[in-house]
Amino acid sequence: MTETRPGPKPRISILVPTPLLITEITEPAAHRNRSSHESDVLMHPGGQGLWVARMAGSLGADVSVSGPFGGELGSLIRTMLDGLGMQVNAVRYGYGNGGYVYDLRGEDRETVAHMPPPELSRHELDDLYGTAFVDALASDVLTVTGAEPGDVVPASFFGRLIRDTRDAGTTVVADLSGKPALAAVAANVDVLKISHEEVLDLELVAEDTAEALVSAGHMLLERGAGAVVISRAKDPALLVEKDSVREVSAPSITPLAHRGAADSMTAGISVGLARGFDLVEAVALGASAGALNVARRGLGTGNRTTIEKFAREITVRTLS
């Protein structure tokens, strides 16, 4: 892997269509016997885009996020992001942000409450587009993440932003699924990161064998993507380019959590490209970030030095 040299921080601009407030109820770190309901209550900024942003920051990037913020939850999320040192390009959100409350005291994560955010209005979409586009022009890489629920932002929005940003000369990495993923491909996104489950949802192939997924990757290249990275949970990821197919694998790690690897991988790819790595090196950095994130408590968290050292242990094997 290319060694990181001292110099200006790589700048990553991240589109975050649905910033969320995540509240978790856990067993108390220390029992003080002060209440029959004694528990720890933790609050975090969350959602796909903010988890990508946290990992990009952990990897030493100068991170800015563009998204809608409003209502009581929006104010809390912005304050938390300020504390993490992120630049927040906030668009006014009339109805306000959504969030989750999870109970982690049992063996499985239990959803206690879910407040889904409403779709953005026409004027809010216009403001978000302009804010994200202008910020991307001052960045090394624009990373585009999806909305949850999907109807908050229309698929055409992603395609327009990606096309215009690429035409202006900024590299674009997209971590999208469904119609937004296809819109990104049609807009000639530089790198599409997508999971094997999401590939199946596109109905390009009927099974998730490596051969079928590679075939789907080539279909996405034919439709306009520059490269496709397919994550496969515990199995090696696939990097599909026009003239090559590579398998990217990490040493086995016992996970503490099964969520967060894909978002961390996207962050690593984005930071690698922003540093000037070639795509194979960037994907190796992403694979390292993703593998180590599941060995930690906290989505999108990681240690830069550890991730960069572990990236040397990532195996990249050429399949064709």
Question: What residues fall within each predicted segment?
Answer:
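Conserved N-terminal subdomain of the carbohydrate kinase-like
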Residues: 32-34, 39, 58-141, 309-320
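Short beta-strands and strand-loop turn motifs
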Residues: 112-113, 139-147, 175, 193-196
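Conserved phosphate/ATP/ADP-binding segment of small-molecule kinases
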Residues: 156-172, 176-243
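Hydrophobic anchor at the start of a short beta-strand
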Residues: 12, 61-63, 88, 172, ...
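Conserved phosphate-binding/catalytic region of the ribokinase-like
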Residues: 3, 210-320
